[in-house]
From Swiss-Prot:
Organism: Klebsiella pneumoniae (strain 342)
Family stated for the protein in its record: Belongs to the DnaT family.
Keyword DNA-binding among UniProt keywords: yes
GO annotation terms (biological process): DNA replication, synthesis of primer
Protein name (Swiss-Prot/TrEMBL): Replication restart protein DnaT
Length: 179
């Protein structure tokens, strides 16, 4: 049983080595946290407290009632893969790039350090739905890769700033300027 125990009684390792019996007897709940280098090293328990914890663990491991649900209620049906339309198609709301999209983008010469975020995908889909243009699935993925690359590069690779944050001027004076 590996866990952390909340106790208000603690001791340093050296003190515990010298008077372990007295420290355990003095604790009200039968537990002492022993610290080494300002971090908990281990917990010392009285036999009575250990028996309480083991009984509690055994009780929690048993089911709370004798009613059991049939396994069919726990089995979720396998998600049917969304079929990619053949040929050219207009962008639709549930469109998703392939699972290996980052690898494909790299093959097309577009290195994406992070996967496409749901926000980036939603913006792309919304834009192209309104346009109403038709392309093949691979062409849509190439457009998405270029779109993400351009949007990320437009901010110098930095994450977008929070427009609601209050800016704070720095007090650094560049070389060559008087302060």
């Amino acid at each position: 049983m590996s866990s952390r125990i909340l106790t208000s009684h603690f001791s340093g390792l050296e003190e515990f080595l010298q008077q372990h019996a007295a420290l355990l007897a003095k604790s009200t709940d039968g537990t002492v946290a022993v610290f080494a280098n300002n971090a908990p090293a281990f917990y010392a328990l009285t036999p009575a407290r250990l028996a309480q914890l083991l009984e509690l663990e055994a009780r929690l491991a048993r089911p709370g009632s004798d009613i059991a649900l049939a396994p069919q209620f726990f089995e979720e049906p396998a998600a049917a893969p969304v079929a990619v339309p053949m040929g050219k198609f207009a962008m639709y709301a549930d469109w998703q790039p392939d699972a290996d999209f980052q690898r494909l983008a790299a093959l097309w010469g577009i290195a994406l350090s992070q996967p496409v975020t749901p926000e980036e995908l939603a913006a792309f889909v919304a834009y192209w739905q309104a346009e109403g243009k038709v392309f093949h699935h691979v062409q849509w993925q190439q457009k998405l890769a270029r779109s993400v690359q351009i949007s990320r590069a437009s901010n110098g690779g930095q994450p977008k700033r929070d427009v609601n944050s209050v800016s704070e001027p720095d007090s650094h004076i560049p070389r060559g300027f008087r302060g």
